[in-house]
A protein has these predicted regions:
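Low-complexity, intrinsically disordered Gly/Pro/Thr-rich segments
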Residues: 156-165
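Basic side chains
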Residues: 6, 89, 159-160
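N-terminal domain-onset segments
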Residues: 18-94, 98-150, 164-187
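Bacterial Sec-dependent signal peptides at the C-terminal "C-region" and cleavage site
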Residues: 2-21
Length: 187
């Protein structure tokens, strides 16, 4: 177990064992995020620990109709030649009807299986769940309190990260915009 995971365990235990729920802090939330390679998995843990919904399943709602230009050097970051298709998803991740994050995800379609690409193109399944069999890791590139570029108003925490395959090849570049719903008291 990595050091980030060890740091997150006491936070999760305190949240699960507490009888009256204190308000969550951004520091606690960030510890849980840092302990997982997938924001989807971290949000699922957080939703369950905070009891934000009776069924702590994370669901993605694809936001269609909006095209967002990628950062200028993204093809270089993802190590993609000019003719390779880059996938893009803009989603809201929710737990029990509470929107926990809005995310922009640019990814190397050639590094996913055809079935994974089809699932991403045709369903609302979260990227982290679809790509989990690839055992990717997460390299945090930056974060800030509040809204970063690409994030909507009301964002309380923003992260930028690069997801890498076990061989080090870049899989995806993500911008994650976390909402105040993560800090809400349970229902």
């Amino acid at each position: 177990m990595g050091s980030d995971a060890r740091l997150a365990l006491p936070v999760l235990a305190a949240l699960l064992l507490g009888t009256s729920e204190p308000p969550a802090t951004l520091d606690q939330f960030e510890q849980v995020l840092a302990a997982q390679p997938s924001a989807t998995a971290a949000l699922g843990q957080w939703c369950a620990a905070r009891r934000l919904a009776p069924d702590p399943q994370i669901r993605a709602a694809v936001i269609s109709g909006r095209t967002t230009d990628p950062p200028g050097d993204l093809r270089r970051i993802l190590d993609l030649s000019g003719d390779v298709r880059m996938g893009y998803r803009h989603v809201r991740l929710s737990c029990g009807g509470k929107v926990l994050s809005e995310a922009h995800n640019w990814y190397a379609t050639e590094r996913l299986t055809p079935e994974m690409n089809r699932t991403l193109d045709e369903t609302d399944t979260p990227f982290g769940r679809v790509a989990a069999p690839l055992r990717f890791t997460r390299e945090r590139l930056g974060g800030e309190r509040g809204a970063a570029s690409y994030c909507p108003r009301g964002t309380v925490l923003s992260h930028r990260a690069l997801l890498r395959l076990p061989d080090g090849a870049p899989l995806a570049y993500v911008v994650e915009c976390y909402t105040a719903q993560n800090l809400a008291r349970p229902d």
